[in-house]
Amino acid sequence: MASLFKKKTVDDVIKEQNRELRGTQRAIIRDRAALEKQEKQLELEIKKMAKIGNKEACKVLAKQLVHLRKQKTRTFAVSSKVTSMSTQTKVMNSQMKMAGAMSTTAKTMQAVNKKMDPQKTLQTMQNFQKENMKMEMTEEMINDTLDDIFDGSDDEEESQDIVNQVLDEIGIEISGKMAKAPSAARSLPSASTSKATISDEEIERQLKALGVD
């Protein structure tokens, strides 16, 4: 019973209209088919009367044929009008659905904008940038310290290996000459094993120097 008193939506109304238009279109097609059948019968009757020389009957039947053909032409015009109405109804339905979708989207965007705080979002992004730069600076300073500790410990050995490899590629004679040449003693500076302490004050100072609050 509740469905009987339910208010029809726009879609329901449009569906009903489309059903009525389709029914009208089918009725027009049936009428046209009947007119075409009657048209053929009249044409045969006119030919029959012409064969027997009945001019008066031919004139009467010819007038009926003209009237019938005009009526058939009208069915094509009406059918085109019904098709146009059906197309227009579909276009209107599509436009209304688009308007409904835009309305829903606008409401969603409005709700999101109410929840969002631009100042808070900006502050969050600035804090992220600040902390990210602090992390990068800390990592860079640690890497520099580690490089100072470990760089150069194997420089002498690696350099000698490279020299030996090149001499082997050039030839034994040159290698022999190079072996007799006095080698320059190099003293590597001892790497400091003391680890630099990175304070928050130092990081803040460098961030301010970079223009990051």
Curated annotation (Swiss-Prot):
Modified residues (Phosphoserine): S199
Entry's localization field: Cytoplasm, Cytosol; Late endosome membrane
Record PTM N-acetylalanine, positions in chain: A2
Chain spans, region Disordered: 179-199
Coiled coil ranges: 25-55
Entry GO CC: amphisome membrane; autophagosome membrane; cytoplasm; cytosol; ESCRT III complex; extracellular exosome; glutamatergic synapse; kinetochore
Protein topology in the membrane: Peripheral membrane protein
Entry keyword annotation includes Acetylation: yes
Motif MIT-interacting motif mapped to chain: 201-211
InterPro entries (UniProt xref): Snf7_fam (IPR005024)
Keyword Cytoplasm found: yes
UniProt-listed Gene3D superfamilies: 6.10.140.1230
Tissue specificity comment: Widely expressed. Expressed in brain, heart, skeletal muscle, spleen, kidney, liver, small intestine, pancreas, lung, placenta and leukocytes. In brain, it is expressed in cerebellum, cerebral cortex, medulla, spinal cord, occipital lobe, frontal lobe, temporal lobe and putamen.
Signal peptide positions on this chain: none
Keywords associated with the record: Acetylation, Amyotrophic lateral sclerosis, Coiled coil, Cytoplasm, Disease variant, Endosome, Membrane, Neurodegeneration, Phosphoprotein, Protein transport, Transport
Main location class: cytoplasm
Any one GO molecular function term: protein domain specific binding
Top-level division of the source organism's lineage: Eukaryota
Bias type Low complexity, positions: 179-194
Subunit: Probable core component of the endosomal sorting required for transport complex III (ESCRT-III). ESCRT-III components are thought to multimerize to form a flat lattice on the perimeter membrane of the endosome. Several assembly forms of ESCRT-III may exist that interact and act sequentially. Interacts with CHMP2A. Interacts with VPS4A. Interacts with VPS4B; the interaction is direct.
Described purpose of this protein according to its UniProt entry: Probable core component of the endosomal sorting required for transport complex III (ESCRT-III) which is involved in multivesicular bodies (MVBs) formation and sorting of endosomal cargo proteins into MVBs. MVBs contain intraluminal vesicles (ILVs) that are generated by invagination and scission from the limiting membrane of the endosome and mostly are delivered to lysosomes enabling degradation of membrane proteins, such as stimulated growth factor receptors, lysosomal enzymes and lipids. The MVB pathway appears to require the sequential function of ESCRT-O, -I,-II and -III complexes.
Family classification: Belongs to the SNF7 family.
Comment, domains: The acidic C-terminus and the basic N-termminus are thought to render the protein in a closed, soluble and inactive conformation through an autoinhibitory intramolecular interaction. The open and active conformation, which enables membrane binding and oligomerization, is achieved by interaction with other cellular binding partners, probably including other ESCRT components.
Disease: Frontotemporal dementia and/or amyotrophic lateral sclerosis 7: A neurodegenerative disorder characterized by frontotemporal dementia and/or amyotrophic lateral sclerosis in affected individuals. There is high intrafamilial variation. Frontotemporal dementia (FTD) is characterized by frontal and temporal lobe atrophy associated with neuronal loss, gliosis, and dementia. Patients exhibit progressive changes in social, behavioral, and/or language function.
Protein name in UniProt: Charged multivesicular body protein 2b
Lineage, uppermost ranks: Eukaryota, Metazoa, Chordata, Craniata, Vertebrata
